């Protein structure tokens, strides 16, 4: 692996005593000194938290027919949304495997802004650029914009205190200004709570972070790292690319078919996904709730009461809200909700119940 890239807020994280780790080729904060993941998680569920997720990619597809072109490539149907609306979508290969899951911001028929995952940005840009018609440009803007996520019940109040738009519908976005500086504001997130993702220019990230952090902490909130982001998204059953979605785990298997425009005449992987949907997937993503002290972790083996192997855990953690182990697992088509399964937790058998996520109730809208 080459040298890790850093967020424009790296020095701020160091000042806050952040524990950092590699994630998608970036050095990012996992948790902050003095509190830890459990406190950061609780802050988001009960008040508000601020995350630096500037490692996320950014790209723009622009030119005559740009939106129509994107719609023939990515799975979801951009015709379902209009200008000022964002949409969760997938970039698949010809086998139906998931190259990435990402957010498409629909600006206009000739302008679509994309936010892929950090490690997959270059590949998404490469694939789109290779197929782009004459006049349509695909531009990698990875370090042109930072991304700050403000998440939790008090998130709208935080934005109002900064004079930023806070009343938009879920998955709507707007070009706004903060102290004369441009910032994209989207009503979205990865936690299950009310929240916003703010995209300032890279050079404007530090002053915006500083003011946001002051307001957030004044409302009883905390800066939060990727550790809490992972526990929050797992409680909601949101998939993480590379674990619950991948080149070998299709949208049909991962229950992400809602993000596929099945009636569209074209998108990458269409034929393979239609065939898999018609036949029924051989395995599907389920939730697991521990019945003892066992905590599921990725790649742990899952078996039935008779010892037959049923699949493996793809994501797992201790749920700070439920105070028990929870996880996501890719399991055989014979499995159904309510089944009890055995998970090999470091050589010890832990009994878990198969459930359909989310594990907790939340209100992202």
Curated annotation (Swiss-Prot):
Q: Which UniProt keywords apply?
A: Aminotransferase, Transferase
How does it associate, per the subunit comment? The glycine cleavage system is composed of four proteins: P, T, L and H.
Q: Origin, by domain of life?
A: Bacteria
Q: Which NCBIfam families match?
A: gcvT (TIGR00528), PRK00389.1 (NF001567)
Entry GO CC: cytosol; glycine cleavage complex
Q: Name one GO biological process term.
A: glycine decarboxylation via glycine cleavage system
Keyword presence, Ribosomal protein: no
Q: What Pfam families does the entry give?
A: GCV_T, GCV_T_C
Matching entries from PANTHER family are given as: AMINOMETHYLTRANSFERASE, AMINOMETHYLTRANSFERASE, MITOCHONDRIAL
Its UniProt entry gives the catalysed reaction(s) as:
N(6)-[(R)-S(8)-aminomethyldihydrolipoyl]-L-lysyl-[protein] + (6S)-5,6,7,8-tetrahydrofolate = N(6)-[(R)-dihydrolipoyl]-L-lysyl-[protein] + (6R)-5,10-methylene-5,6,7,8-tetrahydrofolate + NH4(+)
Q: What is this protein called?
A: Aminomethyltransferase
Homology family = Belongs to the GcvT family.
């Amino acid at each position: 692996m080459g040298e890790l890239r850093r967020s424009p807020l790296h020095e701020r994280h160091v000042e806050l005593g952040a524990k950092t780790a590699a994630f998608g080729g970036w050095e990012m904060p996992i948790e902050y000194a003095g509190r830890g993941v459990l406190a950061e998680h609780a802050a988001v569920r009960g008040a508000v938290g601020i995350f630096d997720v500037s490692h996320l990619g950014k790209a723009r597809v622009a030119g005559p027919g740009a939106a129509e072109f994107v719609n023939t490539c990515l799975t979801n149907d951009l015709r379902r949304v209009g200008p000022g609306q964002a949409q969760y979508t997938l970039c698949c290969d010809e086998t139906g495997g998931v190259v990435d899951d990402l957010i498409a911001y629909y600006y206009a028929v000739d302008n679509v802004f994309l936010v892929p995952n950090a490690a997959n940005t270059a590949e998404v840009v490469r694939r789109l650029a290779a197929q782009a018609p004459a006049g349509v440009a695909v531009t990698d803007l990875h370090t042109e914009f930072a991304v700050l996520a403000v998440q939790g019940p008090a998130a709208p109040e935080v934005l109002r205190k900064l004079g930023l738009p806070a009343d938009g519908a879920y998955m709507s976005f707007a070009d706004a200004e903060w102290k004369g500086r441009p910032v994209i504001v989207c009503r979205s997130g990865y936690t299950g709570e009310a929240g916003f993702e703010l995209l300032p220019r890279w050079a404007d990230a530090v002053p915006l972070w500083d003011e946001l952090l002051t307001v957030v902490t004044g409302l009883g909130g905390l800066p939060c790292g990727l550790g809490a982001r992972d526990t929050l998204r797992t409680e909601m059953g949101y998939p993480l690319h590379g674990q619950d979605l991948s080149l070998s785990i299709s949208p049909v298997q991962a229950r992400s078919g809602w993000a596929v425009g099945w009636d569209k005449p074209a998108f990458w992987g269409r034929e393979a996904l239609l065939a898999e949907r018609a036949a029924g997937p051989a395995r599907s993503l389920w939730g697991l709730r521990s019945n003892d002290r066992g905590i599921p972790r990725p790649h742990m083996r899952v078996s039935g009461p008779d010892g037959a192997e049923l699949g493996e855990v793809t994501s797992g953690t201790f749920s700070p809200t439920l105070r028990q182990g929870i996880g996501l697992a890719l399991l055989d088509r014979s499995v159904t909700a309510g089944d009890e399964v055995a998970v090999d937790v470091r050589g010890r058998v832990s009994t878990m119940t198969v459930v359909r996520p989310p594990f907790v109730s939340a209100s992202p809208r």
